[in-house]
Amino acid sequence: MRNLAQLPPGARARIDGFGSGIRPEVGRRLRELGFVDGNVVRCVRRAPFGGPRVYAVSGAAFALEMHVAAHVLLGPADGDDGVRG
């Protein structure tokens, strides 16, 4: 299963939950921000040298470090294969 850290800029995907290694407080905060099962997320841009990426979800944009984004599991967005076209 893909994770959010693997989503290329411009691509969309549906959130399918969190990996088992995520700390409970991090998962709780991500859910508060809109990273909830079924929501569609889009990678807006990435910072150079492996820095944080900016993701749009629930009408807002958030920067997440790669090690946090790696815990957000993804499936294809409805009508989308998750790949930029």
Describe the role of every protein-language-model region.
Residues 16, 34, 54-57:
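Short, acidic/hydrophobic/Gly-rich beta-strand patch recurrent on exposed beta strands
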Residues 23-29:
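Short alpha-helix capping/helix-loop boundary micro-motifs
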Residues 11, 47-50, 54-85:
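C-terminal structural segments of small proteins and small subunits
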